[in-house]
């Protein structure tokens, strides 16, 4: 699947993002996803392959690698709880705002896309409720509240700061929802609980 990151530099008057919003990628990952989308369209158009094109916005949950935001913060909290790290969470940009979808909801969305969406077209998938947008700073604070270690400091570390930031990514998923009837069922609290518990178990079992 593609990614909401493909949109990159978005202005406030362009929110929420839709299928026709201009792409202004600001990192190599986003460019690679755009290339993937274009080549998939070529295979649909030229060779008749049954390809469903989607751009998925932030989805989180257990087993996501800790090079990403929420897993990285949860991983650090789990280490702090085990005494493996000082009570300081190291971060990059944390004022960027996103709305988050649980990976289980996203997997259901992918299945519905395959079953109900006409091939060749583009669909945005994600939680697009503007009342459920969180900055990464807010997410970290919610994770800290779930920890048995309360006096955890948040500290920006230059090595984790991207040279370019994407302040807000909010997608308009109306087209996809109308075709499939999909709605995300799992909220941010369960997303954070599931992610934090995964990393707690991981560290206990691996002495990481």
Predicted features, each with a name:
Residues 88-93, 122-123, 137-140, 148-168:
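C-terminal "lid/loop" region of Rossmann-like NAD(P)-dependent oxidoreductases
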Residues 5-53, 58-60, 64-65:
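Catalytic helix-loop patch of NAD(P)-dependent Rossmann-fold dehydrogenases
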Residues 106, 110, 125, 136-139, ...:
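Non-catalytic, hydrophobic alpha-helical segments
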Residues 188-208:
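Amphipathic terminal alpha-helices
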Residues 34, 59-75, 82-87, 103-104, ...:
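Glycine/proline-rich active-site loop of Rossmann-fold NAD(P)-dependent oxidoreductases
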Residues 19-20, 47-50, 74-90, 116, ...:
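A short C-terminal helix-loop "cap" of Rossmann-like NAD(P)-dependent dehydrogenase/epimerase domains
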Residues 103, 122, 159-183, 187:
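Conserved C-terminal active-site "lid" loop/helix of NAD(P)H-dependent oxidoreductases
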């Amino acid at each position: 699947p593609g990614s909401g990151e493909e949109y990159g530099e978005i202005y406030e008057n362009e929110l929420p993002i839709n299928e026709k919003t201009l792409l202004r990628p600001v990192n190599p990952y986003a460019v690679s996803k755009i290339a993937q989308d274009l080549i998939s369209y070529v295979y649909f158009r030229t060779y008749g392959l049954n390809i469903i094109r989607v751009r998925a916005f932030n989805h989180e949950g257990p087993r996501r690698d800790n090079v990403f935001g929420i897993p990285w913060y949860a991983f650090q909290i789990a280490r702090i709880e085990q005494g493996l790290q000082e009570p300081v969470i190291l971060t990059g940009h944390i004022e960027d705002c996103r709305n988050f979808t649980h990976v289980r909801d996203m997997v259901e969305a992918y299945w519905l896309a395959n079953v109900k969406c006409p091939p060749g077209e583009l669909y945005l998938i994600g939680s697009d409720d503007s009342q459920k947008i969180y900055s990464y700073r807010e997410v970290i604070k919610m994770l800290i509240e779930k920890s048995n270690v309360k006096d955890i400091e948040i500290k920006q570390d230059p090595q984790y700061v991207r040279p370019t930031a994407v302040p807000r990514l909010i997608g308009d998923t109306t087209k996809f929802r109308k075709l499939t009837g999909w709605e995300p069922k799992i909220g941010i609290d369960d997303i954070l609980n599931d992610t934090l518990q995964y990393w707690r178990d991981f560290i206990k079992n691996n002495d990481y």
